[in-house]
């Protein structure tokens, strides 16, 4: 039995088995704290991926998102792809297929990754033993140009 889901050592009211609820939490709470867009000079498109997503539809959606026409407003276009736990493998497959198709068209792509985690506390065999698990969260930012307006100090450039 799970006693609680924690992020940054703060208890969150999340059901870790509900991908919709967790992906919404990542989009609304976790990602804004990681990629600070303080001056709003970057247009960020979000794409949460679960293991049930269709690869072809997701790749097409990513392609549309990265080519959006917000540049006319002087905004830099960034796509934020994110997932957690058992969904990360599907996310990586979709991301690599998307990048392969994008680079195939002689376009350059820039990528930044951030790995963080949820902490889960489970009941042990007795009340004195508590089991702690980490559920990984992967956040990836991709753009067709260098990201200069986001605070990416915690991200690793790919």
Curated annotation (Swiss-Prot):
<dbReference type="GO" id="GO:0000294">
    <property type="term" value="P:nuclear-transcribed mRNA catabolic process, RNase MRP-dependent"/>
</dbReference>
<dbReference type="GO" id="GO:0003723">
    <property type="term" value="F:RNA binding"/>
</dbReference>
<dbReference type="GO" id="GO:0005655">
    <property type="term" value="C:nucleolar ribonuclease P complex"/>
</dbReference>
<feature type="coiled-coil region">
    <location>
        <begin position="51"/>
        <end position="71"/>
    </location>
</feature>
<keyword id="KW-0819">tRNA processing</keyword>
<dbReference type="GO" id="GO:0005634">
    <property type="term" value="C:nucleus"/>
</dbReference>
<keyword id="KW-0539">Nucleus</keyword>
<comment type="subunit">
    <text>Component of nuclear RNase P and RNase MRP complexes. RNase P consists of an RNA moiety and at least 9 protein subunits including POP1, POP3, POP4, POP5, POP6, POP7, POP8, RPP1 and RPR2. RNase MRP complex consists of an RNA moiety and at least 10 protein subunits including POP1, POP3, POP4, POP5, POP6, POP7, POP8, RMP1, RPP1 and SNM1, many of which are shared with the RNase P complex.</text>
</comment>
<dbReference type="GO" id="GO:0000460">
    <property type="term" value="P:maturation of 5.8S rRNA"/>
</dbReference>
<protein>
    <recommendedName>
        <fullName>Ribonucleases P/MRP protein subunit POP6</fullName>
        <ecNumber>3.1.26.5</ecNumber>
    </recommendedName>
</protein>
<dbReference type="InterPro" id="IPR002775">
    <property type="entry name" value="DNA/RNA-bd_Alba-like"/>
</dbReference>
<dbReference type="GO" id="GO:0034965">
    <property type="term" value="P:intronic box C/D snoRNA processing"/>
</dbReference>
<keyword id="KW-0698">rRNA processing</keyword>
<dbReference type="GO" id="GO:0004526">
    <property type="term" value="F:ribonuclease P activity"/>
</dbReference>
<dbReference type="GO" id="GO:0042134">
    <property type="term" value="F:rRNA primary transcript binding"/>
</dbReference>
<comment type="function">
    <text>Component of ribonuclease P, a protein complex that generates mature tRNA molecules by cleaving their 5'-ends. Also a component of RNase MRP, which cleaves pre-rRNA sequences.</text>
</comment>
<dbReference type="GO" id="GO:0005829">
    <property type="term" value="C:cytosol"/>
</dbReference>
<dbReference type="GO" id="GO:0006364">
    <property type="term" value="P:rRNA processing"/>
</dbReference>
<keyword id="KW-0378">Hydrolase</keyword>
<dbReference type="GO" id="GO:0005697">
    <property type="term" value="C:telomerase holoenzyme complex"/>
</dbReference>
<dbReference type="Pfam" id="PF01918">
    <property type="entry name" value="Alba"/>
</dbReference>
<dbReference type="GO" id="GO:0000172">
    <property type="term" value="C:ribonuclease MRP complex"/>
</dbReference>
<dbReference type="GO" id="GO:0008033">
    <property type="term" value="P:tRNA processing"/>
</dbReference>
<dbReference type="GO" id="GO:0001682">
    <property type="term" value="P:tRNA 5'-leader removal"/>
</dbReference>
<keyword id="KW-0175">Coiled coil</keyword>
């Amino acid at each position: 039995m799970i006693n609680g889901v924690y992020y940054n050592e703060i208890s969150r009211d999340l059901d870790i088995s509900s991908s919709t609820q967790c992906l919404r939490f990542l989009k609304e709470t976790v990602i804004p704290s990681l990629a600070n867009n303080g001056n709003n000079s970057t247009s960020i498109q979000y794409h949460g991926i679960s293991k049930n997503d269709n690869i072809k539809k997701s790749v097409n959606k990513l392609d549309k998102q990265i080519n959006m026409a917000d540049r006319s407003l002087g905004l830099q276009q960034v796509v934020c792809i994110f997932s957690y736990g058992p969904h990360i493998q599907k996310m990586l497959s979709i991301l690599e297929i998307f990048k392969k198709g994008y680079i195939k068209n002689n376009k350059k792509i820039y990528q930044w990754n951030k790995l963080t985690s949820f902490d889960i506390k489970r009941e042990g065999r007795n009340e004195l033993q508590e089991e702690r698990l980490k559920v990984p969260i992967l956040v990836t930012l991709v753009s067709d140009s260098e990201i200069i307006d986001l605070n990416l100090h915690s991200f690793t450039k790919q």
